[in-house]
């Protein structure tokens, strides 16, 4: 059951699965708040100041319980918010219901179609006679929609040749919008002060735009805050990957041979999680530095094509395109589990499997029969497995990430004149502040430098303690 509640614009006030889930969602939000000390500290610090008063934020990020705490923090700090999920499978319907019940516009339900996904992304950008002035993005879809739509206003032929199902839905949604408002995208784009981007893939898009000198507004790269990438990407994946695989399949991980493709922070956490439950873990990498790191951690570094027939569990974590191809898929052993923990769904060539028999076992779990007669288990249709088949990262680690997001929104909204159309990272002292806000919760006690010690290493007693070049 999908419920929408219309207001006096062409955009409904919310689109969710079931408003009756709001009480359940509220109970889980209350629990999550106790595990998100960073966000709660920002509420206390800025409650009276309201540094986001006047901010109109279009949010495109997984609509989970943890995100609900983020949304309500933004609102408590003065912002107006409209929200959609950045993945068709990642919404927790009770979280969306709780946000809708509070009167915050939200457009998200688990299991959206691609057409619905792009419609909802349009909804967060459409404020009627008003306009959003900030974007909070995860993967760059909201930002990318404005940029592509603006191009289509001038030359509709950019929408002529979609290369996949996703682009077909995206291009169709832009054409439909242009039929009723031919200047929608450029008008909204001109009102955007800036964007804060959550994830590796979205940040890569922003840097590409910067390189092409086509970034339309300033951007803060939240992903590369140390307290995001070295915590969310690493420790979050270390817990949520195996959670999702076990919820989806009930498989015994101990003794299985697993291949993690990509050994960045996400891959490192994924490999640790599988090894922690007794899997024999191998790693595939293109980067010699990451490959050497994997080898020094005791993982076998292999080529996919050399081991594909021997692997029980495949995990892609690269942010790249078709790292598991049709040629790899058809060689897989019977009952091999195939999943992705990178942001987009194109790391695995799922489209090539469409011609083979599919049997849906349960939501986001499919049995696919290969020409060899072997069956593989595909999770979340190749999309983010930890949010498609489970509930994503734990609240505590997401508090790190989302505290960075709130600080980035405050910084960009209040100091826009200091930022050019480039990509920035938050300064080191804010990164350290985020870490400080989370220490008490886990009983950690900081040692304090003496003045003499601080002078000896040429830092302030209060920090920052490391140079911008330090890699942690």
UniProtKB/Swiss-Prot annotation:
Subcellular location: Cytoplasm
Entries under PROSITE patterns matching the protein: ADOHCYASE_1 (PS00738), ADOHCYASE_2 (PS00739)
Entry's Gene Ontology BP terms: L-homocysteine biosynthetic process; one-carbon metabolic process; S-adenosylmethionine cycle
Pathway membership, UniProt: Amino-acid biosynthesis; L-homocysteine biosynthesis; L-homocysteine from S-adenosyl-L-homocysteine: step 1/1
Top enzyme class: hydrolase
Residues that, per the record, bind NAD(+): 199-201, 233, 262-267, 285, 320, 341-343, 386
Keywords for the protein's UniProt record, in alphabetical order: Cytoplasm, Hydrolase, NAD, One-carbon metabolism
Cellular component terms (Gene Ontology): cytosol
Cofactor note text: Binds 1 NAD(+) per subunit.
Binding residues annotated for substrate, in chain numbering: 64, 138, 198, 228, 232
Reaction(s) catalysed by this chain's protein: S-adenosyl-L-homocysteine + H2O = L-homocysteine + adenosine
An example Gene Ontology molecular-function term: adenosylhomocysteinase activity
The EC number(s) this enzyme carries: 3.13.2.1
SMART domains xrefs: AdoHcyase, AdoHcyase_NAD
Cofactor: NAD(+)
Any matching Pfam family: AdoHcyase
Family: Belongs to the adenosylhomocysteinase family.
Annotated PANTHER family: ADENOSYLHOMOCYSTEINASE
Described purpose of this protein according to its UniProt entry: May play a key role in the regulation of the intracellular concentration of adenosylhomocysteine.
The protein, known as: Adenosylhomocysteinase
Organism, as annotated: Prochlorococcus marinus (strain MIT 9215)
């Amino acid at each position: 059951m999908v419920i929408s509640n219309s207001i006096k614009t062409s955009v409904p006030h919310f689109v969710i699965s079931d408003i009756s889930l709001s009480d359940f969602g509220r109970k889980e939000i209350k629990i999550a708040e106790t595990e998100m000390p960073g966000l709660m500290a920002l509420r206390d610090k800025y409650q009276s100041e309201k540094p986001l008063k006047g901010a109109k934020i279009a949010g495109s990020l997984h609509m989970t319980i943890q995100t609900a705490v983020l949304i309500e923090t933004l609102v408590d700090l003065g912002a107006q918010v409209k929200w959609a999920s950045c993945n068709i499978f990642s919404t927790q319907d009770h979280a969306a219901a709780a946000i809708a019940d509070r009167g915050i516009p939200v457009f998200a339900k688990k299991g959206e179609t691609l057409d619905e996904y792009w419609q909802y992304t349009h909804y967060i950008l459409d404020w009627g006679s008003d306009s959003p002035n900030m974007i909070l993005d995860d993967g760059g879809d909201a930002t990318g929609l404005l940029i592509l739509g603006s191009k289509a206003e001038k030359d509709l032929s950019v929408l002529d040749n979609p290369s996949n199902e996703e682009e077909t839905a995206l291009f169709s949604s832009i054409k439909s919008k242009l039929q009723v408002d031919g200047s929608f995208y450029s008008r909204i784009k001109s009102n955007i002060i800036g964007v804060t981007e959550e994830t590796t893939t979205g940040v890569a898009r922003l840097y590409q735009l910067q390189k092409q000198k086509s970034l339309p507004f300033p951007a803060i790269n939240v992903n590369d805050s140390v307290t995001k990438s070295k915590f969310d990407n690493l420790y979050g994946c270390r817990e949520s990957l195996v959670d999702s695989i076990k919820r989806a399949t009930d498989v015994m991980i101990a003794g299985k041979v697993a291949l993690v493709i990509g050994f960045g922070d996400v891959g490192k956490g994924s490999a640790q999680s599988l090894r922690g439950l007794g899997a024999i873990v191998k790693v595939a990498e293109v980067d010699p530095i990451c490959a050497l790191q994997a080898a020094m951690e005791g993982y076998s570094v292999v080529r996919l094509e050399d081991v594909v027939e021997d692997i029980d569990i495949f995990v892609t974590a690269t942010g790249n395109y078709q790292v598991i191809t049709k040629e790899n898929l058809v060689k897989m052993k019977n009952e091999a589990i195939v999943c992705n923990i990178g942001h987009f769904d194109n790391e695995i060539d799922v489209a090539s499997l469409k011609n083979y028999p599919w049997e849906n076992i349960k939501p986001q779990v499919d049995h696919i029969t290969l020409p060899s007669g072997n069956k593989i288990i595909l999770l979340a249709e190749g999309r983010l497995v930890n949010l498609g088949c489970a509930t994503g990262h734990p609240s505590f680690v997401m508090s790190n990430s989302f505290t960075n997001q709130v600080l980035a929104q405050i910084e960009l909204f209040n100091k826009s004149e200091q930022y050019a159309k480039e990509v920035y990272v938050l300064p080191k002292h804010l990164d350290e502040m985020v870490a400080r806000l989370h220490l008490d919760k886990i009983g950690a006690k900081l040692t304090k430098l003496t003045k003499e010690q601080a002078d000896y290493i040429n830092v302030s007693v209060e920090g920052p303690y490391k140079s911008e070049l330090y890699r942690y």
